Swiss-Prot record:
Domain named N-acetyltransferase: residues: 2-151
Name of the featured protein: N-terminal acetyltransferase complex ARD1 subunit homolog
PROSITE patterns for the chain: GNAT (PS51186)
Any one GO MF annotation of this record: protein-N-terminal-glutamate acetyltransferase activity
Keywords carried by this UniProt record: Acyltransferase, Transferase
Function: Seems to be involved in N-acetylation.
Enzyme Commission code(s) on record: 2.3.1.-
Region feature Disordered, mapped onto this chain: 177-203
Species for this entry: Dictyostelium discoideum
Keyword GTP-binding: no
Length: 203
């Protein structure tokens, strides 16, 4: 039986070990400590019936956007996968970000090649692709930047903004295309006022 509970300072070493075992993106201990001290309510661990940490989610609030939560890292030991643990961890983090920090949304990054993780985020947790960030990872692999809106009204507003941005972009491109067409030099013609111009042949 696996239970989900808030992260405690004594869990940080186990979280780091799970990270090193499961993921290519690794962090020094001071990074986990920084998360725990700065956002103590947003990170959770999965614990088995023997008290062992078998998974974790490390979450925070974006320093530049105080209404935007972010999932820094999610890991579940291979022996404990396919049991819904990752989904439970993510749901707990989403609730904490909304209730504690009143976050509008939560974002994350996932490797384009990580189909299992993408399927979890997109199909199960309903995250949407926001953009593709080129060479995001240290090995130059691209990342999907994904977002889940925690408030329906905020999602609707963002969708309206995106549609307006698309309309404005299309209008701008149309205006620029018209300008280029007007600026193109017209072909020189030897017909003047409907009459063929006589061109003197030089012998």
């Amino acid at each position: 039986m696996v239970s989900i509970r808030p992260c405690q300072i004594g869990d940080l070493m186990s979280m780091q070990n799970a990270n090193l075992t499961c993921l290519p993106e690794n962090y020094q201990m001071k990074y986990y400590l920084y998360h725990f001290l700065t956002w103590p309510q947003t990170s959770f661990v999965a614990e088995d019936d023997k008290g062992n940490v078998v998974g974790y989610v490390l979450a925070k609030i974006d320093e530049n956007e105080p209404k935007r939560g972010h999932i820094t890292s999610l890991a579940v030991l291979r022996s404990q996968r396919k049991l819904g643990i990752a989904t439970k961890l993510m749901k707990q983090a989403e609730v904490a970000l909304l209730e504690v920090y009143d976050a509008d949304c939560v974002s994350l990054h996932v490797r384009k090649s990580n189909r299992a993780a993408f399927s979890l985020y997109h199909e199960v947790l309903k995250f949407k692709i926001d953009e593709i960030e080129k060479e995001y990872y240290g090995d130059k692999e691209d990342a999907y930047s994904m977002v889940l809106y925690l408030k329906p009204e905020v999602e609707e507003e963002k969708e309206r903004e995106k549609q307006l941005e698309k309309i404005n972009k299309a209008a701008k491109e149309s205006i620029e295309a018209a300008k280029r067409a007007n600026e193109e030099p017209k072909p020189v013609s030897n017909v003047i006022h409907g009459k063929k111009k006589n061109v003197k042949k030089i012998e």
